[in-house]
């Protein structure tokens, strides 16, 4: 007996990937006159992409539990809590932090990530290929679209490295290079 929407979708559609997952294929390499410093930069980026907090190491996210609410956080009807209030940790893994005065979950991370990373989630389904110390190949998914801000930040932080970034979002049928 089928008991959930997920099971119904699996029965109807099989094991297909739902749209709005953007596939990213990134190749990072030196200039051809690779030095130990270039190789060290490639190794550092490899480590960053292998970690769970990939984008947060490239463009650091604020420490939300220690960020008091600002007046601007409560504009446009998004009343999270009282000005200056800190979110409190709760044991629910889905909500994690709540403003006690309103009971509303702290969602400030969402707008910040969209504005600063161009996507709501960090990289996921990451596969790193590092057969060559002078080159790094990484494939991963992001929500909705490629994280253009992350691509630009890597190029800015590592000017001696070349970055080739291809993305493909099959749900909306767009692809290209950054």
What does each model-identified segment do?
Residues 1-17:
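N-terminal amphipathic/basic-hydrophobic helices that include classical n-h-c signal peptides
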Residues 12, 16-178:
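Long, contiguous binding/interaction regions
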